Amino acid sequence: RQGGDFMHGRVLLTPLFCLLAPVAVIPLLVPEASRMARSAGYLYAGATGVLWLAVVGWALWAANSPGMGPDATRVTATGIVDERRFYAQATGHAHPLTAADYLDYPRMRAVLTAIRNTPDGALLLPAGNYDTWDVVPAIPPPPDAPTGPDGDRNGPHTVFFTNLGMLGMNVGLDVRVIDQIGLANPLAAHTARIEDGRIGHDKNLFPDWAVAEGPFLKEEPWIPQYLDEDWIRQAQAALACPETESVLNAVRAPMSPRRFLSNLANAAEFTRYRIDRVPLYELARCGLPLPEPVNPPYTGLPATGP
């Protein structure tokens, strides 16, 4: 249950290593010393020594560079971060290794409480403070909907948050975890990158899209005040763009021989495909009609005032 363009590289590391391991035992033929001129040998040894010293120097610099400024509180211009130091500081654990260690990260315990308190399902959005989540309720199930063995319902839950690893390990496999920067969210991954943004974190999908694409209530008073009902309706309409549907079906539809061949044939096109993260602009890009607005646009008329 993993997805997103950015994550494929991490997920493929283990099988790639297994594929390359047999190649590592194939012997390489090295020229005999007698066949190498003395001057060439000196040059070869010197170049190897310089390269080794350069790697050692770089390693020493990297090991002693905090990467987030002297107080480890901000991402510097390099975009390189000492992740261990960051999470040690954020969780209060010198060596955070287990899922339980990351429950002390801001919002982590609160997300478990929010899921327990919404048995019919909900979309959870990170609130401005660190111990609560904003809840968008799921569309209520019918009265005769089946319940679990303990009599409780297990509605659709989606959590919209950046830190996927600690979240996924603690909420379990029945909770959908997506992010706004495209690490494991195909929709966010296909938005245009923000210029000069931190690499791998240079996209930012508005939460209105998460409401639009899920089985959640999409109107007031069920949505947080910082979301716009018209934006949600526009995002919902924009998801009907045929090209966007094709890209999303490539990763969401059931795998079959036909789907596999289609993904292979369209891989380059799907990878290049980008949407606009502003729903109104995305509708214009795709040539789709604008939904009827819920709230009439403000025009400043009639004029009021002295």
Predicted segment positions?
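Hydrophobic/aromatic-rich transmembrane helices and adjacent perimembrane loops
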Residues: G4-S39
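Short catalytic/ligand-binding loop motif for oxyanion handling, primarily in non-cytosolic enzymes
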Residues: D5-G9, A62-G69, G168-N170, N185-A189
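Phosphate/oxyanion-binding loops and surfaces in catalytic or ligand/nucleic-acid-binding neighborhoods
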Residues: A21-A24, L60-N64, D174
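Signature aromatic-anchored transmembrane alpha helix within multi-pass, membrane-resident enzymes
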Residues: L29-G69
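Transmembrane helical bundles and short interhelical boundary loops of multi-pass, membrane-embedded
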Residues: A54-A90
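C-terminal luminal/periplasmic domains and tails of membrane-associated envelope-modifying transferases
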Residues: F86-P306
